[in-house]
């Protein structure tokens, strides 16, 4: 006899008992008492089974998501989810449940995984209690659902320090920091690539870009014709180092410069085929020439100029034998580095637009600083000018020799000098000097699909090719890391910025503080710094209130007329703080790594704090010191721990691809 039958029989006996009022009262009261007891017991059991079903449902959802990310077939995912669900039902009979799995229908960047479970609950006492009051026995069925949004795609920019100090040995190792970094970075790429290769149904599941940085960032010389570069000299920083008024029609009517609507143009027949085209840094690279070879003409003489006129033409000369035919070639080509845009565009992903010239990117062109590299202008073995040294480090050309007593500033900015032809056999510039000075890194490698072996190898080859040289400008590296994963120009390989199911991540590693080199030259050309991504700090930006670009939008803690290395570092730190906030507000996940920085060193401590503040919060880990807060995506690494730290980064990135 079942529980309900036993209960019914007991109640029946009381109902038929005629032995006094006690029996009658007992019969009257036992019915609601037993019904209440049945309801209490069954309700508690119902809540327990419902709770266990929900727990099993959540666990099955996470397990199914992992199978989808790993590339399992639809049928295998559903079977795995069912098995996982039933295994976690604890004391519930799987026969009383049913699981429905709805797979994502978007395999190119996310989607929603939905699991619904129905539970049929068989109460213990409620059916009998219902019969006692004239009701009918029944089971209870309820359904619960759980949804997980899959993040199937990932775009990662590796922003890696290539400054000179990366050639130092990593602490606790006998290896150079740059070599330790190469190994760790390639290991990270391999780990994520292996996971990506298992995702058969998803296009470009994991992509990596590489941004080597030092004093500047190299976007690549192949972009010299792109529309996001300033092709017409419209940017307000395009000509800040140049004085085109020195090329006036009065000085040379055949070859002069004219400004029209903010753009300088080539005027006069002396420009040849490029007449009436804009004067830009690109045009300067194209127009500077050097005599790179010569061939003797038999039985010949040549005319050698002894005295020049003010316009550069010969006044007196003599004949000398033999005569040579000289071959000229371009002196230098743009290597690919760009200057930082003026605020606010230096700390943003704003799309370059010719209607807003300050948004355009300008190629770096390090001016020839005061001092004449060669003194013999006519190859006769006799110096035509007297050398003047200003102790500048980037003296790679001759100053215009036909002005009496020029100042250092005039020597540096007089544009006529760049159209002199460098004589055959004249002194060469020192290594690293020239218009590409401070451009020391290899070009950016844009996003590559590392699920494809060939593209994965491109990233790894670019990592291997890194070489340390130059200062440290973390914000420029970070800004370009952001731009490589963005869908906005210049680099448009990233998925749409608004696409759900895709994470954009920038991993930044540096081994030191931000640096911008100061120089003591107040009595010379007033450069105040070496030339780098922010140009010379001695120059002010138009409309900024006489502030140099590096100091724009900085706090009162930054002395606006303090031209020291420490003040430059503080200014770069503030630029980085603003940039980090902007990137994170644009849903960029920022991970930062400090390499061999000591918390007990004041300078290192500032760099550590800045990097930690820049980093995003982890979505999965808690702060070990305060479990109520998320952990920061920051690693204070040493040379000895770098490999393990990058494994932790790989784990964090792997988790991003499962659920959000």
Where on the chain are the PLM-derived regions?
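Short amphipathic secondary-structure patches
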Residues: 2, 47, 51, 61-123, ...
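Alpha-helical assembly-interface signal, strongest on the long, hydrophobic N-terminal helix that forms
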Residues: 2-79, 615
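Acidic, polar low-complexity linker/tail segments
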Residues: 8-29, 108-157, 166-170, 482, ...
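Structural recognition of the beta-strand scaffold that forms the well-ordered cores
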Residues: 24-25, 55, 155-160, 208-212, ...
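MIDAS-like acidic motif and immediate structural context at the N-terminus
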Residues: 35-38, 42, 149-177, 181, ...
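…and closely analogous acidic/polar surface helices at protein-protein or active-site interfaces
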Residues: 49, 166-207, 381, 389, ...
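Solvent-exposed loop/turn segments at secondary-structure junctions
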Residues: 121-123, 162-167, 214-218, 469-470, ...
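Acidic, Ser/Thr/Gly/Pro-rich low-complexity segments that form flexible
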Residues: 222-602, 619, 623
């Amino acid at each position: 006899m079942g529980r309900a039958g036993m209960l019914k029989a007991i109640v029946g006996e009381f109902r038929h008992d005629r032995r006094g009022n006690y029996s009658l009262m007992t019969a009257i009261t036992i019915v609601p008492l037993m019904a209440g007891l049945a309801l209490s017991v069954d309700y508690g059991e119902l809540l327990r089974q419902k709770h266990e079903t929900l727990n099993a449902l959540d666990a099955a959802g996470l397990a199914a998501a992992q199978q989808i990310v790993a590339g399992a077939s639809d049928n295998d995912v559903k079977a795995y989810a069912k098995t996982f669900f039933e295994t976690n039902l604890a004391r519930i009979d799987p026969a009383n449940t049913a699981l429905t799995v709805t797979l994502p229908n978007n395999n190119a960047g996310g989607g929603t995984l939905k699991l619904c479970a129905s539970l049929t609950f068989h109460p213990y006492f409620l059916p009998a209690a219902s019969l006692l009051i004239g009701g009918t026995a029944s089971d209870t069925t309820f359904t619960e659902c759980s949804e997980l949004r899959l993040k199937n795609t990932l775009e990662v920019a590796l922003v890696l320090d290539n400054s000179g100090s990366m050639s130092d040995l990593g602490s606790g190792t006998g290896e150079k920091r740059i070599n330790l970094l190469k190994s760790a970075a390639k290991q990270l790429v391999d780990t994520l690539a292996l996971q990506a290769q298992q995702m058969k149904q998803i296009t470009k599941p994991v992509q990596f870009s590489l941004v080597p940085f030092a004093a500047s960032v190299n976007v690549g010389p192949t972009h010299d014709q792109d529309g996001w570069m300033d092709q017409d000299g419209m940017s307000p920083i395009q000509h800040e180092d140049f004085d085109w008024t020195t090329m006036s029609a009065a000085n040379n009517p055949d070859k002069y410069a004219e400004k029209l609507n903010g753009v300088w143009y080539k005027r006069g027949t002396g420009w040849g085929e490029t007449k009436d085209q804009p004067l830009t840094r690109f045009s300067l690279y194209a127009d500077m020439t050097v005599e790179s070879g010569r061939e003797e003409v038999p039985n010949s003489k040549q005319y050698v100029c002894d005295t020049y006129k003010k316009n550069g033409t010969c006044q007196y000369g003599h004949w000398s034998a033999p005569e040579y035919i000289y071959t000229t070639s371009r002196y230098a080509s743009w290597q690919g580095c760009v200057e930082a845009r003026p605020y606010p565009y230096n700390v943003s992903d704003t799309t370059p637009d010719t209607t807003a010239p300050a948004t355009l990117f300008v190629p770096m062109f390090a001016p020839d600083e005061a001092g004449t590299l060669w003194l013999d202008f006519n190859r006769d073995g006799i110096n035509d000018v007297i050398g003047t040294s200003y102790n500048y480090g980037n003296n790679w050309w001759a100053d215009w020799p036909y002005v009496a007593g020029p100042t250092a500033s005039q020597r540096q900015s007089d544009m006529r000098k760049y159209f002199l032809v460098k004589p055959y056999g004249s002194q060469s510039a020192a290594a690293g000097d020239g218009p590409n000075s401070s451009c020391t890194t290899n070009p950016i490698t844009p996003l590559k699909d590392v699920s494809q072996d060939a593209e994965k190898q491109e990233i790894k080859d670019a990592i291997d090719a890194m070489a340390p040289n130059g200062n440290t400008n973390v914000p420029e590296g970070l800004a370009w890391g952001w731009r490589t994963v963005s869908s906005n120009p210049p680099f448009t390989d990233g998925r749409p910025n608004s696409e759900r199911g895709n994470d954009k991540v920038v991993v930044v590693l540096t081994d030191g503080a931000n640096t911008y080199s100061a120089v003591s030259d107040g009595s010379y050309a007033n450069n105040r710094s070496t030339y780098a991504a922010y140009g010379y700090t001695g120059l002010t930006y138009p409309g900024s209130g006489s502030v140099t670009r590096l100091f724009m939008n900085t706090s009162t803690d930054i002395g606006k007329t303090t031209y020291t290395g420490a003040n430059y570092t503080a200014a770069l730190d503030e630029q980085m703080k603003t940039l980090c906030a902007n990137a994170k507000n644009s849903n960029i996940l920022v991970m930062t790594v400090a390499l061999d920085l000591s918390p007990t060193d004041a300078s290192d401590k500032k760099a550590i704090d800045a990097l930690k503040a820049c980093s995003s919060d982890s979505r999965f880990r808690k702060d070990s010191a305060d479990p109520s807060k998320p952990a920061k995506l920051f690693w204070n690494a040493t040379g000895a721990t770098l490999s393990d730290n990058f494994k932790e980064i790989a784990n964090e990135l792997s988790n991003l691809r499962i659920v959000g």
